[in-house]
Amino acid sequence: MDRRTAIGLGLAAAVARPALADTLVVGDGVLPGDPKENILLWPGLPPGGEGLSLPPIRVHNHEPPFLTPTDRAIDRIGLPVMNVFRPDKPDGSAMIIAPGGGYSREMLDFEGMDVARRFNGAGITCFVLRYRLPGEGWANRQHVPLQDAQRAMRLVRGNAARYGLDEAHIGFMGFSAGGHLAASIATCFDDNVYKAVDAFDQVDARPSFSVPMYPVITLGEGAHVGSRNNLLGPNPSKELVDFYSLQTRVLADTPPTFIAVAADDTVVLPLPNALAYYTALQVSRVPSEIHLFEAGGHGFGLARTVGRPTAAWPDMLLRWGASHGFFKNAVL
């Protein structure tokens, strides 16, 4: 099925909110291992895509050492989608999950689908976000990931009844550059970064809770240079750098936040990133918790935690979420 024949989003005539069509799949956007249910983010051309023609989505292995046979990275994302992972026993909560990859690719499995399946086991409905990459030709590249994150939050919350969700229990998790996106939607949820395309865009985009994992936070001193350049371009203005240095964007309405990071992370340094963000959360009195593991490196996700203290982070998150009333099946 090509894009022209894909089923789009429709507005329900007799209800206050729009409803999703039954199936949202597109030919080159469906990959092996995708669940049966996939939500196309935009009903037409995504913002900033005028005149852009991307080749089909590219799937390749992560660099060695390979972790699993399905340790995939993807790029050339012209059609942003959410893969829907429904639990057998839903508890009414949900998480949108944004894989990392330095804003140049996305680690589809160990920071995406594997994570979704893990939290399905706790009753959480998960949506793995395949967001557009800013350096692939989109206009206003700096806002492209945030556009998709805002739209994803609005689609999930706008269809809470369809998925059996509590609108107040919908969070956003991200890893590395995806952690930057998680912090972006937590602090910039009401920034006007695209023109409304339908009634979903009137829905609140603020996450109920935020989970930036070993996140990129600052784009100034101490930044992960690759993520900064891929998001903002090679010579960004100070205004842009400040806008997306998210430790400066925290306010009292930033949602409750759980952070996990390893002290020996030499890729995205904890001090100017995760720890600076946690400090800003504390200054603004945002309910927040950070776990600074002695060892674990960068990008531990799920696959690199076996036999290590970092293996505890999913249960720590579940207990934290339960303490705030977001998750019902976690044991405190």
Give the role of each language-model region.
Residues 1-14:
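N-terminal secretory signal peptides and thylakoid transit peptides that target proteins
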Residues 60-69, 199, 215-249, 255, ...:
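Mobile cap/lid helix-loop segments that gate and shape the active-site cleft of serine hydrolases
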Residues 92-100:
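Short beta-strand element of the alpha/beta-hydrolase
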Residues 107-115, 131-166, 306-310:
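Catalytic nucleophile-loop/oxyanion-hole region of alpha/beta-hydrolase
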Residues 154-224, 241:
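Primarily recognizes the serine-hydrolase "nucleophile elbow" in alpha/beta-hydrolase
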Residues 259-261:
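Short beta-strand/loop motif that positions the catalytic acidic residue
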Residues 267-273:
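Conserved alpha/beta-hydrolase "acid-adjacent" motif
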Residues 275-332:
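C-terminal catalytic histidine-bearing segment of alpha/beta-hydrolase fold enzymes
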